[in-house]
Curated annotation (Swiss-Prot):
Name of this protein: Putative cystathionine gamma-synthase YML082W
Group of enzyme by EC: transferase
Keywords: Amino-acid biosynthesis, Methionine biosynthesis, Phosphoprotein, Pyridoxal phosphate, Transferase
Modified residues (N6-(pyridoxal phosphate)lysine): K451
Molecular function via GO: cystathionine gamma-synthase activity; pyridoxal phosphate binding
GO cellular component terms listed in the entry, alphabetical order: cytoplasm; nucleus
Length: 649
């Protein structure tokens, strides 16, 4: 296995030379601190970033054009993938600006539909909605974008830029097709997107990849276009909007203004280079074996699996679903666009120390108990709450948690849920569907497809799986069929990339499991101790005996391992910084990538809440490692070299 190119300069995209990369290089410990302290020099270096935190240049260009054309004085905007999402954002802004004179406007845009079968191969109707607010409230829009994950992707933004602001009114279909071919090569087939989504859902539902899925006639290729035409160009042309944009909302937001439906006159030529996807060389027989003990519960891909533009969007939707369930219990009708929560909703529970934005989104939209230890003590605390007579709506839990790799007792949670009537929502992103099978213990399972499922770190997406045996299943199924509540907003090009990337996700997961255990056992564990470099290793079979027992209860029988994510802590920050700086690896946010990725998780995520994080064992000097597909010998040498250089200081 050839190791991936390593980004070494601050702000470089990870992977290198990838227009839609979802990580960014922070080569030194100091660069991370400078970033969270908002050093302008560091911020100005960033050429990439995680999509919910960093605005991709294509999205920013789209925003700039929309602000120039449609914004009123001092207004700014954010783009969302549908009108209904924009309305939910508007409700969020209204709630945040309840005592201020906030004004919110929504502009709807749509690209033209394909008019025949041939055009369907390179043309797609795309509707977006733009939320305009006073610039003073821009951070509120950013919060909604970040917390809920209901975002537009950079590929979608590229397509909208071209279709709405580049194509001349009299441009021919042949000229539009030529643009698509320039971006992707002649064989990219937009019509394959629906089939791609079917395959993605099937893989999530069955945890099996069939060789027969890859019919050669359905394949597509990513061929390089004219490199002289790959850079962004600032050419403005006359263009027109799809006349089918009809204003659905006439209440006009806080200010009482009608949502805008103006026609733009200028546009931007914007192209991206192709991104070849290299397949793993692992034997496919590992990937396609039927009934490998991965699934204890069968689900229907089309009926029970749903796709989203991000993993956070799936968690947010699961939360909205349960709030709607609770509102019916109270005989209150909640409008689908109203994502706020007010008493007497039952409270939700976060069990364990979760990914930061999971905590944020639940606390923003409902009252929440935060049981951050995620162990037996938290279970006792939850039991105490339940025995007090208070009714709980749901428990959200990561399996295992990020970044401490703790595993709660799902069997005990399941027993309590049946006894006291709350629901269980599992985020399976870190463990992965090959390693653990949490669905029998959950009502809903959410996951980020951006991570191990994709692996290539060049596309973002999420999924939700409903447990057909859950008592909320019938309600959830109806909820997910309502257009006001759920829309398939995964852009067609992103679906195509996700399908292609995930064709070997099972084999990749197995390989990463083995490499991680090798790295821990042979290289890192000998250096853990009171007078040694590392203070502690957090990994499902090392965090604690309790975590190991709980993890093994739900580990897939045959091929399930402990995953590719672990965290290291140090006795002091000097050694933590030196070790990080000496690692000759890609260093940036995200996890589950095909290449090994290191990152000072606590510094980046909780720099301004360090006391809170450390209260739950998430130390300032924690370094999170996501193991990739490099050979064990290469990984061993890289980590050993960093250890040797660090102990010398």
């Amino acid at each position: 296995m050839v190791s991936a190119q390593v980004a070494t300069e601050l702000g470089q995209p990870i992977p290198l030379d990838t227009q839609h990369a979802v990580s960014v290089c922070f080569p030194t410990w100091k660069s991370v601190i400078s970033y969270v302290e908002k050093d302008p020099k560091v911020l100005g270096c960033l050429k990439s970033g995680y999509p919910r935190f960093w605005i991709h240049p294509s999205i920013q260009k789209l925003r700039d054009i929309l602000i120039e054309k449609y914004a009123k004085e001092n207004e700014t905007c954010f783009c969302f993938p549908s009108y209904r999402v924009a309305k939910r954002c508007r409700e969020y802004v209204r709630r945040k600006c309840a005592h201020r004179n906030g004004k919110v406007r929504i502009l709807q845009l749509a690209t033209a539909k394909p008019i025949n079968e041939e055009q369907k191969t390179w043309k797609r109707e795309c509707k977006i909605a733009v939320v305009f607010v006073d610039g003073a409230y821009e951070n509120i829009l950013k919060q909604y974008w970040q917390y809920t994950g209901e975002i537009i992707s950079s590929r979608l933004a590229e397509y909208v830029l071209h279709e709405l602001f580049m194509v001349e009114k009299k441009s021919s279909p042949a000229e539009e097709k030529e643009y698509i071919e320039m971006r992707y090569g002649r064989n990219l087939n937009f019509a394959f997107a629906d089939r791609a989504k079917e395959l993605i859902k099937k893989r999530i539902a069955t945890k099996v990849i069939d060789k027969d899925e890859h019919d050669e006639e359905e394949n597509y290729h990513f061929l390089a276009g004219n490199q002289d035409e790959q850079d962004f160009q600032d050419t403005f042309l006359d263009s027109s909007l799809n006349e089918a944009n009809h204003g659905e909302d006439h209440d006009g937001g806080i200010s009482g203004e009608v949502d805008s439906q103006e026609e733009p006159h200028n546009g931007l030529v914007s192209t991206i280079p192709p991104e070849p996807i290299e397949m793993s060389t692992i034997e496919e027989e590992q990937s396609v074996e039927e009934d490998a003990g991965r699934c204890a519960l069968r689900v229907c891909p089309e009926r029970d699996v749903f796709l989203f533009p991000s993993g956070m969007a799936s968690i947010f939707t699961a939360h909205r679903l349960l709030l709607q369930w609770d509102s019916l219990r109270l005989n209150r009708s909640r409008n689908g666009s109203d994502v706020t929560s007010s008493p007497p909703n039952k409270k939700t529970v976060i069990f364990g120390f979760p990914y930061a934005d999971t905590l944020h989104v639940l606390q923003e939209f409902n009252e929440t108990y935060f049981l951050g230890e995620g162990d037996e003590s938290s279970m006792k605390e939850l039991t105490k709450i339940l025995h007090s007579g208070e009714q709980i709506l749901a428990v959200f839990i990561e399996t295992p948690s990020n970044p401490l790799l703790k595993m709660g007792n799902l069997l005990e949670l399941k027993r309590l849920s049946e006894l006291f009537g709350f629901f269980i929502i599992i985020d399976e992103t870190v463990g992965g569907i090959v390693n653990i099978d949490g669905l029998p213990f959950a009502d809903i399972v959410c996951s980020s497809l951006t991570k191990t499922f994709s692996g290539d770190s060049n596309v973002i997406g999420g999924s939700m799986v409903l447990n057909p045996q859950s008592r909320v299943y019938e309600f959830a199924s109806r909820f997910m069929q309502l257009e006001d509540e759920y829309e398939d907003l995964l852009w067609c090009e992103d679906a195509i990339y996700l399908e292609r990337n995930s064709r070997d996700f099972i084999a990749r997961t197995i390989r990463i499991n083995y490499s991680t255990e090798y790295l821990l056992d042979k290289i890192l564990k000998p250096h853990v101790g009171e007078n040694k470099l590392f203070k502690k290793i957090y990994y499902p079979n090392l965090t604690s005996k309790e975590t190991l027992t709980n993890y093994d209860m739900v580990r897939c029988k045959k091929e399930g391992g402990y995953g590719g994510l672990f965290s290291l802590t140090f006795h002091d920050e000097d050694h933590a910084a030196a070790f990080y700086d000496n690692l000759k690896l890609n260093k940036g946010p995200s996890l589950g990538t095909n290449f090994t990725l290191a990152f000072p998780y606590t510094l980046m995520t909780y720099y301004h809440e360090l006391d809170m994080a450390e209260k739950f064992g998430v130390e300032r000097n924690l370094l999170r490692i996501s193991v990739g597909l490099e050979s064990q010998s290469i990984l061993g040498k890289i980590f050993q070299e960093a250890i040797d250089k660090t102990v010398e200081i």
